[in-house]
Amino acid sequence: MRIAMHLPLLLLYIFLLPLSGANNTDAAHEVIATNTNNWAVLVSTSRFWFNYRHMANVLSMYRTVKRLGIPDSQIILMLSDDVACNSRNLFPGSVFNNKDHAIDLYGDSVEVDYRGYEVTVENFIRLLTDRWTEDHPKSKRLLTDENSNIFIYMTGHGGDDFLKFQDAEEIASEDIADAFQQMYEKKRYNEIFFMIDTCQANTMYSKFYSPNILAVGSSEMDESSYSHHSDVEIGVAVIDRFTYYCLDFLEQIDKNSTLTLQDLFDSFTFEKIHSHVGVRTDLFDRNPSEVLITDFFANVQNVIPDDSKPLSVSHYHHYKDHIDTAQYELNNNVLDLALETYRKNNQSSKIEKKIKDIKSTSVLDVDIDSNECFFTSFKQSATIILALIVTILWFMLRGNTAKATYDLYTN
Protein backbone atom coordinates (compact mmCIF):
# COMPACT_ATOMS: atom_id res chain seq x y z
CA MET A 1 0.00 0.00 0.00
CA ARG A 2 2.85 2.40 0.87
CA ILE A 3 4.47 1.76 -2.51
CA ALA A 4 1.20 2.53 -4.28
CA MET A 5 0.79 5.74 -2.29
CA HIS A 6 4.16 7.08 -3.43
CA LEU A 7 4.05 5.70 -6.98
CA PRO A 8 3.25 9.06 -8.60
CA LEU A 9 6.18 10.71 -6.83
CA LEU A 10 8.50 7.98 -8.07
CA LEU A 11 7.16 8.39 -11.60
CA LEU A 12 7.61 12.15 -11.42
CA TYR A 13 11.18 11.77 -10.20
CA ILE A 14 12.03 9.28 -12.96
CA PHE A 15 10.55 11.52 -15.65
CA LEU A 16 12.45 14.57 -14.37
CA LEU A 17 15.76 12.79 -13.90
CA PRO A 18 16.85 13.18 -17.57
CA LEU A 19 16.61 16.95 -17.15
CA SER A 20 19.58 16.85 -14.81
CA GLY A 21 22.76 18.07 -16.53
CA ALA A 22 24.72 15.23 -14.94
CA ASN A 23 22.53 12.61 -16.58
CA ASN A 24 21.72 14.16 -19.93
CA THR A 25 24.57 12.47 -21.76
CA ASP A 26 23.14 12.84 -25.26
CA ALA A 27 22.95 16.61 -24.99
CA ALA A 28 26.37 16.80 -23.39
CA HIS A 29 27.94 14.92 -26.30
CA GLU A 30 26.40 17.35 -28.77
CA VAL A 31 28.27 20.34 -27.39
CA ILE A 32 31.61 18.99 -26.22
CA ALA A 33 34.34 20.63 -28.25
CA THR A 34 37.17 19.03 -30.16
CA ASN A 35 39.53 21.91 -29.37
CA THR A 36 40.48 22.87 -25.84
CA ASN A 37 42.73 25.84 -26.61
CA ASN A 38 43.10 28.49 -29.30
CA TRP A 39 46.37 30.07 -30.41
CA ALA A 40 47.31 32.89 -32.77
CA VAL A 41 50.54 33.31 -34.75
CA LEU A 42 50.71 36.84 -36.18
CA VAL A 43 53.59 37.70 -38.50
CA SER A 44 54.66 40.88 -40.29
CA THR A 45 57.53 39.85 -42.55
CA SER A 46 58.60 43.31 -43.73
CA ARG A 47 60.54 46.16 -42.16
CA PHE A 48 61.35 49.86 -42.67
CA TRP A 49 59.16 52.94 -42.33
CA PHE A 50 57.47 52.77 -45.75
CA ASN A 51 56.01 49.38 -44.74
CA TYR A 52 54.18 51.00 -41.81
CA ARG A 53 50.91 49.42 -42.98
CA HIS A 54 52.21 45.87 -42.49
CA MET A 55 52.96 46.51 -38.84
CA ALA A 56 49.54 48.14 -38.49
CA ASN A 57 47.97 45.09 -40.16
CA VAL A 58 49.43 42.61 -37.71
CA LEU A 59 48.87 44.81 -34.64
CA SER A 60 45.23 45.19 -35.68
CA MET A 61 44.82 41.41 -35.72
CA TYR A 62 46.65 41.23 -32.40
CA ARG A 63 44.22 43.68 -30.86
CA THR A 64 41.25 41.70 -32.23
CA VAL A 65 42.22 38.28 -30.85
CA LYS A 66 43.12 39.83 -27.49
CA ARG A 67 39.77 41.61 -27.36
CA LEU A 68 38.05 38.28 -27.96
CA GLY A 69 39.89 36.63 -25.10
CA ILE A 70 43.01 34.90 -26.37
CA PRO A 71 45.72 35.70 -23.78
CA ASP A 72 49.23 36.86 -24.63
CA SER A 73 50.53 33.50 -23.45
CA GLN A 74 48.77 31.96 -26.46
CA ILE A 75 49.70 34.63 -29.00
CA ILE A 76 53.01 34.64 -30.87
CA LEU A 77 53.71 38.09 -32.33
CA MET A 78 56.50 38.52 -34.88
CA LEU A 79 57.24 41.97 -36.33
CA SER A 80 60.14 44.27 -37.11
CA ASP A 81 58.99 46.70 -34.41
CA ASP A 82 60.79 49.60 -36.07
CA VAL A 83 57.85 51.94 -36.61
CA ALA A 84 56.55 53.18 -33.25
CA CYS A 85 59.84 54.79 -32.26
CA ASN A 86 60.99 55.70 -35.75
CA SER A 87 62.36 59.24 -36.01
CA ARG A 88 59.88 59.97 -38.81
CA ASN A 89 56.88 59.07 -36.66
CA LEU A 90 54.97 62.25 -35.84
CA PHE A 91 53.29 60.32 -33.00
CA PRO A 92 56.19 58.72 -31.07
CA GLY A 93 55.37 55.42 -29.43
CA SER A 94 52.10 55.04 -31.33
CA VAL A 95 50.86 53.10 -34.35
CA PHE A 96 47.51 53.78 -36.02
CA ASN A 97 45.51 51.91 -38.64
CA ASN A 98 43.23 54.79 -39.52
CA LYS A 99 43.76 58.45 -40.28
CA ASP A 100 41.32 59.41 -37.53
CA HIS A 101 43.84 58.08 -34.95
CA ALA A 102 41.00 56.58 -32.93
CA ILE A 103 42.94 53.53 -31.75
CA ASP A 104 46.59 53.45 -30.72
CA LEU A 105 47.54 49.89 -31.66
CA TYR A 106 50.87 50.11 -29.85
CA GLY A 107 49.60 51.52 -26.60
CA ASP A 108 47.74 48.54 -25.15
CA SER A 109 50.34 46.30 -23.50
CA VAL A 110 51.75 44.88 -26.71
CA GLU A 111 53.95 41.84 -26.09
CA VAL A 112 56.27 41.24 -29.04
CA ASP A 113 57.80 37.75 -29.01
CA TYR A 114 60.11 38.05 -32.04
CA ARG A 115 61.25 41.51 -33.09
CA GLY A 116 63.68 43.01 -35.55
CA TYR A 117 66.14 40.53 -36.98
CA GLU A 118 64.58 37.70 -34.97
CA VAL A 119 61.85 37.61 -37.61
CA THR A 120 63.45 35.06 -39.91
CA VAL A 121 62.35 32.12 -42.00
CA GLU A 122 64.27 29.77 -39.72
CA ASN A 123 62.61 31.04 -36.56
CA PHE A 124 59.18 30.89 -38.17
CA ILE A 125 59.66 27.25 -39.22
CA ARG A 126 61.13 26.35 -35.82
CA LEU A 127 58.17 28.03 -34.16
CA LEU A 128 55.64 25.95 -36.10
CA THR A 129 57.49 22.65 -35.69
CA ASP A 130 58.75 23.34 -32.14
CA ARG A 131 62.33 22.45 -33.06
CA TRP A 132 64.13 24.42 -30.39
CA THR A 133 66.96 23.80 -27.99
CA GLU A 134 66.00 23.06 -24.39
CA ASP A 135 66.94 26.54 -23.19
CA HIS A 136 64.57 28.33 -25.59
CA PRO A 137 62.07 30.40 -23.54
CA LYS A 138 58.60 28.88 -23.28
CA SER A 139 57.09 32.31 -23.85
CA LYS A 140 58.54 32.21 -27.38
CA ARG A 141 57.27 28.73 -28.22
CA LEU A 142 54.05 27.57 -29.80
CA LEU A 143 53.00 25.10 -27.10
CA THR A 144 50.07 23.58 -28.95
CA ASP A 145 48.75 20.01 -28.99
CA GLU A 146 46.29 17.86 -30.91
CA ASN A 147 43.37 19.80 -29.38
CA SER A 148 44.61 23.24 -30.45
CA ASN A 149 43.00 25.49 -33.04
CA ILE A 150 45.58 27.84 -34.54
CA PHE A 151 44.96 31.11 -36.39
CA ILE A 152 47.99 32.03 -38.51
CA TYR A 153 48.07 35.51 -40.06
CA MET A 154 50.88 36.73 -42.31
CA THR A 155 51.41 40.03 -44.09
CA GLY A 156 54.24 41.53 -46.10
CA HIS A 157 55.57 41.50 -49.66
CA GLY A 158 55.08 38.35 -51.71
CA GLY A 159 55.05 36.88 -55.17
CA ASP A 160 54.24 33.63 -56.93
CA ASP A 161 54.70 30.95 -54.24
CA PHE A 162 56.99 33.02 -52.02
CA LEU A 163 56.91 35.59 -49.23
CA LYS A 164 59.81 37.91 -48.44
CA PHE A 165 61.20 38.11 -44.89
CA GLN A 166 62.83 41.37 -43.82
CA ASP A 167 63.74 42.14 -47.45
CA ALA A 168 66.63 39.67 -47.03
CA GLU A 169 65.27 36.15 -47.56
CA GLU A 170 62.17 34.32 -48.78
CA ILE A 171 59.94 31.51 -47.61
CA ALA A 172 58.31 29.32 -50.26
CA SER A 173 54.81 27.91 -50.16
CA GLU A 174 56.37 24.42 -50.03
CA ASP A 175 58.24 25.39 -46.87
CA ILE A 176 55.05 26.31 -45.06
CA ALA A 177 53.26 23.23 -46.43
CA ASP A 178 56.01 20.93 -45.16
CA ALA A 179 56.03 22.67 -41.77
CA PHE A 180 52.28 22.10 -41.47
CA GLN A 181 52.76 18.43 -42.31
CA GLN A 182 55.34 18.12 -39.54
CA MET A 183 52.86 19.75 -37.18
CA TYR A 184 50.22 17.23 -38.20
CA GLU A 185 52.56 14.27 -37.72
CA LYS A 186 53.59 15.58 -34.30
CA LYS A 187 49.92 16.19 -33.33
CA ARG A 188 50.44 19.91 -32.85
CA TYR A 189 47.04 21.09 -34.02
CA ASN A 190 43.38 20.25 -34.28
CA GLU A 191 42.55 22.78 -37.01
CA ILE A 192 44.48 25.61 -38.68
CA PHE A 193 43.01 28.77 -40.18
CA PHE A 194 45.66 30.36 -42.43
CA MET A 195 45.15 33.97 -43.56
CA ILE A 196 47.63 35.91 -45.69
CA ASP A 197 47.56 39.50 -46.97
CA THR A 198 50.23 40.04 -49.62
CA CYS A 199 50.58 40.28 -53.37
CA GLN A 200 49.70 36.97 -55.08
CA ALA A 201 48.71 35.69 -51.65
CA ASN A 202 46.61 32.76 -52.86
CA THR A 203 49.69 31.02 -54.26
CA MET A 204 51.08 30.66 -50.74
CA TYR A 205 48.49 28.03 -49.77
CA SER A 206 48.45 26.21 -53.10
CA LYS A 207 50.96 23.59 -51.93
CA PHE A 208 49.27 22.68 -48.65
CA TYR A 209 48.48 18.98 -48.32
CA SER A 210 47.88 18.34 -44.60
CA PRO A 211 44.37 17.78 -43.23
CA ASN A 212 42.18 20.22 -41.32
CA ILE A 213 43.61 23.41 -42.80
CA LEU A 214 41.37 26.24 -44.01
CA ALA A 215 43.10 29.03 -45.94
CA VAL A 216 42.20 32.47 -47.27
CA GLY A 217 44.34 34.90 -49.28
CA SER A 218 43.92 38.48 -50.41
CA SER A 219 44.84 38.13 -54.11
CA GLU A 220 45.23 35.70 -56.99
CA MET A 221 48.38 34.95 -58.96
CA ASP A 222 49.64 38.02 -60.84
CA GLU A 223 47.44 40.28 -58.69
CA SER A 224 48.64 42.91 -56.25
CA SER A 225 47.21 43.54 -52.82
CA TYR A 226 46.53 47.20 -52.28
CA SER A 227 46.68 49.58 -49.36
CA HIS A 228 43.44 51.16 -48.20
CA HIS A 229 44.35 54.74 -47.43
CA SER A 230 47.21 56.98 -46.38
CA ASP A 231 47.57 59.38 -43.49
CA VAL A 232 48.91 62.77 -44.55
CA GLU A 233 50.36 63.39 -41.07
CA ILE A 234 52.16 60.05 -40.97
CA GLY A 235 53.04 60.27 -44.66
CA VAL A 236 52.47 56.61 -45.64
CA ALA A 237 49.64 54.11 -46.06
CA VAL A 238 48.43 52.89 -42.67
CA ILE A 239 46.61 49.64 -43.53
CA ASP A 240 45.98 47.26 -46.44
CA ARG A 241 42.55 46.89 -48.01
CA PHE A 242 42.06 43.19 -47.27
CA THR A 243 42.98 43.55 -43.60
CA TYR A 244 40.96 46.76 -43.31
CA TYR A 245 37.75 45.03 -44.40
CA CYS A 246 38.54 41.97 -42.28
CA LEU A 247 38.72 44.24 -39.26
CA ASP A 248 35.63 46.13 -40.34
CA PHE A 249 33.75 42.83 -40.17
CA LEU A 250 35.44 41.51 -37.02
CA GLU A 251 34.60 44.64 -35.04
CA GLN A 252 30.99 43.42 -34.86
CA ILE A 253 32.13 40.14 -33.30
CA ASP A 254 32.06 39.40 -29.59
CA LYS A 255 32.83 36.22 -27.66
CA ASN A 256 29.28 34.93 -28.06
CA SER A 257 28.87 35.78 -31.73
CA THR A 258 27.22 33.24 -34.04
CA LEU A 259 28.72 34.66 -37.23
CA THR A 260 30.72 32.16 -39.25
CA LEU A 261 33.82 32.22 -41.41
CA GLN A 262 31.54 31.93 -44.43
CA ASP A 263 29.92 35.20 -43.35
CA LEU A 264 33.38 36.76 -43.30
CA PHE A 265 34.26 35.35 -46.73
CA ASP A 266 30.96 36.57 -48.18
CA SER A 267 31.78 40.11 -47.06
CA PHE A 268 34.78 40.28 -49.41
CA THR A 269 34.01 41.81 -52.80
CA PHE A 270 36.26 42.96 -55.62
CA GLU A 271 34.84 46.47 -55.24
CA LYS A 272 36.17 46.57 -51.67
CA ILE A 273 39.41 44.63 -51.93
CA HIS A 274 40.38 45.52 -55.55
CA SER A 275 41.67 41.96 -55.95
CA HIS A 276 40.18 38.46 -55.95
CA VAL A 277 40.12 36.92 -52.49
CA GLY A 278 40.68 33.17 -52.54
CA VAL A 279 39.50 30.49 -50.12
CA ARG A 280 40.74 26.92 -49.99
CA THR A 281 38.45 24.43 -48.22
CA ASP A 282 39.28 21.00 -49.69
CA LEU A 283 41.60 20.06 -46.81
CA PHE A 284 39.12 21.14 -44.14
CA ASP A 285 36.58 18.72 -42.65
CA ARG A 286 33.91 21.32 -41.93
CA ASN A 287 31.99 23.66 -44.18
CA PRO A 288 32.96 27.31 -43.50
CA SER A 289 29.28 28.03 -42.92
CA GLU A 290 29.50 25.74 -39.87
CA VAL A 291 32.69 27.27 -38.46
CA LEU A 292 32.10 30.07 -36.01
CA ILE A 293 34.58 32.91 -36.23
CA THR A 294 35.16 32.49 -32.51
CA ASP A 295 36.44 28.96 -33.17
CA PHE A 296 39.73 30.65 -34.10
CA PHE A 297 39.60 34.28 -33.00
CA ALA A 298 38.35 33.83 -29.43
CA ASN A 299 39.52 31.98 -26.35
CA VAL A 300 38.30 28.57 -25.22
CA GLN A 301 37.26 27.93 -21.62
CA ASN A 302 35.97 24.98 -19.63
CA VAL A 303 35.73 22.31 -22.30
CA ILE A 304 36.47 18.59 -22.46
CA PRO A 305 37.91 17.11 -25.66
CA ASP A 306 35.79 14.50 -27.38
CA ASP A 307 36.66 13.06 -30.77
CA SER A 308 33.15 11.71 -31.28
CA LYS A 309 31.58 15.07 -32.12
CA PRO A 310 33.23 17.78 -34.25
CA LEU A 311 31.58 20.68 -32.44
CA SER A 312 33.54 23.59 -31.07
CA VAL A 313 33.14 25.35 -27.77
CA SER A 314 31.75 28.31 -29.68
CA HIS A 315 28.81 26.13 -30.70
CA TYR A 316 28.51 25.18 -27.03
CA HIS A 317 28.15 28.82 -25.93
CA HIS A 318 25.92 29.55 -28.92
CA TYR A 319 23.46 26.81 -28.02
CA LYS A 320 23.49 27.69 -24.33
CA ASP A 321 22.74 31.32 -25.03
CA HIS A 322 19.81 30.42 -27.28
CA ILE A 323 18.02 27.83 -25.14
CA ASP A 324 14.36 28.74 -25.04
CA THR A 325 13.71 30.44 -21.71
CA ALA A 326 10.00 29.72 -22.06
CA GLN A 327 10.87 26.04 -21.84
CA TYR A 328 12.55 26.66 -18.49
CA GLU A 329 9.53 28.56 -17.23
CA LEU A 330 7.20 25.76 -18.30
CA ASN A 331 9.22 23.17 -16.40
CA ASN A 332 9.39 25.42 -13.36
CA ASN A 333 5.65 26.01 -13.37
CA VAL A 334 4.98 22.29 -13.62
CA LEU A 335 7.12 21.57 -10.57
CA ASP A 336 5.54 24.41 -8.60
CA LEU A 337 2.08 23.12 -9.44
CA ALA A 338 3.02 19.61 -8.38
CA LEU A 339 4.39 20.94 -5.09
CA GLU A 340 1.23 22.94 -4.46
CA THR A 341 -0.89 19.86 -5.18
CA TYR A 342 1.03 17.85 -2.60
CA ARG A 343 0.61 20.63 -0.06
CA LYS A 344 -3.14 20.80 -0.58
CA ASN A 345 -3.43 17.06 -0.06
CA ASN A 346 -1.56 17.25 3.27
CA GLN A 347 1.38 15.15 2.18
CA SER A 348 4.39 14.77 4.41
CA SER A 349 7.25 17.26 4.54
CA LYS A 350 9.53 14.54 3.17
CA ILE A 351 7.62 14.52 -0.11
CA GLU A 352 7.79 18.30 -0.30
CA LYS A 353 11.53 18.16 0.33
CA LYS A 354 11.94 15.55 -2.40
CA ILE A 355 10.31 17.82 -4.99
CA LYS A 356 12.53 20.70 -3.91
CA ASP A 357 15.54 18.43 -4.31
CA ILE A 358 14.39 17.55 -7.82
CA LYS A 359 14.14 21.24 -8.65
CA SER A 360 17.55 21.98 -7.20
CA THR A 361 19.19 19.40 -9.48
CA SER A 362 17.15 20.07 -12.59
CA VAL A 363 17.83 22.21 -15.61
CA LEU A 364 15.98 25.08 -13.96
CA ASP A 365 18.74 26.04 -11.55
CA VAL A 366 21.85 24.88 -13.35
CA ASP A 367 24.84 27.19 -13.51
CA ILE A 368 24.96 28.45 -17.11
CA ASP A 369 28.75 28.64 -16.92
CA SER A 370 29.29 25.04 -15.83
CA ASN A 371 30.94 22.39 -18.00
CA GLU A 372 27.68 20.45 -18.24
CA CYS A 373 25.53 21.55 -21.13
CA PHE A 374 22.16 20.11 -22.05
CA PHE A 375 18.96 20.94 -23.82
CA THR A 376 15.33 20.57 -22.79
CA SER A 377 12.99 19.40 -25.51
CA PHE A 378 9.28 19.43 -26.09
CA LYS A 379 9.29 15.68 -25.61
CA GLN A 380 10.66 16.09 -22.10
CA SER A 381 8.09 18.77 -21.33
CA ALA A 382 5.31 16.50 -22.53
CA THR A 383 6.65 13.79 -20.24
CA ILE A 384 6.60 16.15 -17.26
CA ILE A 385 3.05 17.24 -18.03
CA LEU A 386 1.99 13.61 -18.38
CA ALA A 387 3.54 12.83 -15.00
CA LEU A 388 1.68 15.77 -13.49
CA ILE A 389 -1.63 14.59 -14.94
CA VAL A 390 -1.05 11.08 -13.60
CA THR A 391 -0.23 12.55 -10.19
CA ILE A 392 -3.36 14.71 -10.08
CA LEU A 393 -5.59 11.85 -11.21
CA TRP A 394 -4.05 9.63 -8.55
CA PHE A 395 -4.80 12.22 -5.86
CA MET A 396 -8.38 12.50 -7.07
CA LEU A 397 -8.75 8.72 -6.97
CA ARG A 398 -7.02 8.50 -3.60
CA GLY A 399 -9.28 11.23 -2.23
CA ASN A 400 -12.41 9.34 -3.27
CA THR A 401 -11.02 6.09 -1.87
CA ALA A 402 -10.16 7.73 1.44
CA LYS A 403 -13.66 9.19 1.70
CA ALA A 404 -15.25 5.82 0.98
CA THR A 405 -13.05 4.17 3.61
CA TYR A 406 -13.95 6.83 6.14
CA ASP A 407 -17.67 6.37 5.48
CA LEU A 408 -17.27 2.59 5.81
CA TYR A 409 -15.73 2.84 9.27
CA THR A 410 -18.02 5.59 10.61
CA ASN A 411 -21.33 4.16 9.46
Swiss-Prot record:
Residues 1-22 form the signal peptide. It is an enzyme of class 3 (hydrolase). The disulfide bond between GPI8 and GPI16 is important for normal enzyme activity. Gene3D superfamilies: 3.40.50.1460. It is found in: Endoplasmic reticulum membrane. One of its GO terms (biological process) is fungal-type cell wall organization. Changing residue 85 to A: No loss of activity. It is a single-pass type I membrane protein. It holds the Pfam family Peptidase_C13. Keywords: Disulfide bond, Endoplasmic reticulum, Glycoprotein, GPI-anchor biosynthesis, Hydrolase, Membrane, Protease, Signal, Thiol protease, Transmembrane, Transmembrane helix. The keyword Cell membrane does not apply. Its EC number is 3.-.-.-. Changing residue 199 to A: Loss of activity. Its main location: endoplasmic reticulum. Forms a complex with CDC91, GPI16, GPI17 and GAA1. This is GPI-anchor transamidase. The gene is GPI8.
